[in-house]
């Protein structure tokens, strides 16, 4: 699996054997790449800046983490996948109870209709997704100001819900130590989780890291591990 980026000769390759890092020291190109990736999570169209080599949509494969502490674990993409998996796992006994709940809700609607002196509308059709929304089920990860634990929580969440998703962390190295990064890399490799670190400055290097550096003059090269 590869990503190509306009103005960068070297493609970004992804593997379960190493983590991938793009170090862009040209601030204008860095900003252009980041804007494209963030926008891709909300808009679906062909991008001129960043593309998968097989034409796959960025939003279908990338989970963008621009800010570890404010990452939205309740995003539509995450919640919809979680609901889908829950609905596949729920057994018949639960479904029978759901029918009882649906009957109760219908009776409440009928009572409201009989009790008011004007016409009303109320729902009579419910599905499991509706009841999950009522429960407001959503993931929970460490909320305290511990960046490393938040990163672990995000990796665990995405790895549990999705197959073949790439987690894209932006400027994470600037917030953690070399030792913390090493532990994060080990976690990703052990879980076979594809990750992509995008950095705007020169930083430390890990032996399990494949790094593409783009200097200020837009010259791209692979950095030795």
Each model region followed by its residue ranges:
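Conserved P-loop NTPase mechanochemical-coupling segment
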Residues: 105-146
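Alpha-helical oligomerization segments
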Residues: 178-225
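Glycine-rich P-loop/Walker A and Walker A-like loops and their local beta1-loop-alpha1 context
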Residues: 1-84, 179
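Conserved P-loop NTPase "ATPase switch" module shared by AAA+ and STAND
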Residues: 159-177
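Short acidic, S/G/P-rich loop/turn micro-motifs used as interaction or catalytic elements
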Residues: 27-29, 140-145, 171-177, 203
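Long, charge-rich alpha-helical interaction segments
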Residues: 93-100, 104-108
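GG-anchored amphipathic helix commonly corresponding to the ABC/SMC/Rad50 NBD signature/C-loop
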Residues: 147-163
């Amino acid at each position: 699996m590869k990503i190509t980026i306009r103005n960068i000769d070297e493609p970004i390759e992804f593997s379960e054997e190493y983590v991938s890092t793009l170090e862009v020291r040209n601030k204008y190109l860095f900003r252009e790449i980041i804007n494209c990736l963030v926008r891709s999570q909300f808009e679906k169209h062909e991008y001129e800046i960043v593309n998968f080599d097989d034409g796959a949509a960025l939003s279908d494969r990338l989970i963008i983490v621009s800010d570890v502490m404010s990452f939205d674990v309740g995003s539509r993409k995450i919640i919809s996948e979680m609901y889908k998996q829950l609905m596949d796992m729920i057994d018949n006994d639960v479904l029978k109870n759901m029918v009882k709940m649906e009957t109760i809700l219908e009776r409440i609607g009928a009572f409201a209709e009989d009790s008011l002196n004007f016409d009303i509308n109320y729902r009579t059709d419910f599905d499991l997704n509706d009841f999950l929304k009522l429960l407001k089920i959503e993931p929970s990860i460490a909320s305290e100001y511990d960046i490393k634990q938040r990163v672990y929580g995000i990796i665990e969440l995405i790895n549990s819900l999705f197959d073949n998703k790439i987690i894209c962390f932006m400027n994470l190295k600037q917030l953690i130590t070399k030792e913390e990064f090493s532990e994060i890399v080990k976690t990703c490799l052990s879980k076979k989780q594809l990750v992509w670190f995008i950095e705007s400055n020169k930083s430390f290097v890990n032996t399990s890291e494949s790094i593409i550096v783009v200097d200020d003059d837009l010259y791209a090269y692979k950095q030795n591990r």
